[in-house]
Swiss-Prot record:
Gene name linked to the record: IL21
Signal peptide: 1-23
Protein name (database record): Interleukin-21
Any Gene Ontology CC annotation: extracellular space
Coiled-coil annotated spans: none
GO molecular function, one term: cytokine receptor binding
Function: Cytokine with immunoregulatory activity. May promote the transition between innate and adaptive immunity. Induces the production of IgG(1) and IgG(3) in B-cells. Implicated in the generation and maintenance of T follicular helper (Tfh) cells and the formation of germinal-centers. Together with IL6, control the early generation of Tfh cells and are critical for an effective antibody response to acute viral infection. May play a role in proliferation and maturation of natural killer (NK) cells in synergy with IL15.
Keywords: Cytokine, Disulfide bond, Secreted, Signal
Any GO BP: positive regulation of natural killer cell mediated cytotoxicity
Expression sites (tissue/organ): Expressed in spleen, but not in the brain, heart, kidney, liver, and lung.
Higher taxonomy: Eukaryota, Metazoa, Chordata, Craniata, Vertebrata
């Protein structure tokens, strides 16, 4: 029996397995960043819902039933809206912080870069305007749809 030869094979096999694991992790890192960002957005929307009575009751464009491949376009419509506080005070500061967090860009994905056919998505102005409560519900629904598509 020759142990050193077997030991070399074991070490080589372990190195191959380890390098494959590292390569897989680095290739999926961008996708993980998107998933994490979408989960953060759900939390931000839930926090904003706590202040819905403090928001300016102005009607806002709120995409609904967004076509496939138009999710990011619809999300950017949500981001363009300026949620405003109806009164001054501590809640106004919190609302401003949360809306700034909503406006941060989503991480890029490989699927977005690979998409060659350009889908015609509706303009932001074409969406029905809704009060802040429904605006936030529709935003959360869109983010949940994006998470579901990301995981499938």
């Amino acid at each position: 029996m020759r142990w050193p030869g077997n030991m070399e094979r074991i070490v080589i096999c372990l190195m191959v397995i380890f390098s494959g694991t590292v390569a897989h992790k680095s290739s999926s890192q961008g996708q993980d960043r998107l998933f994490i960002r979408l989960r953060q957005l759900i939390d931000i929307v839930d926090q904003l819902k706590n202040y819905v009575n403090d928001l300016d009751p102005e009607f806002l464009p709120a995409p609904e039933d967004v076509k496939r491949h138009c999710e990011r376009s619809a999300f950017s419509c949500f981001q363009k809206v300026q949620l405003k506080s109806a009164n001054n005070g501590d809640n106004e500061k919190i609302i401003n912080i949360l809306t700034k967090q909503l406006k941060r860009k989503l991480p890029a994905t490989n699927t977005g870069r690979r998409q060659k056919h350009e889908v015609t998505c509706p303009s932001c102005d074409s969406y029905e305007k809704k009060p802040p409560k429904e605006y936030l519900e529709r935003l959360k629904s869109l983010i949940q749809k994006m998470i579901h598509q990301h995981l499938s």
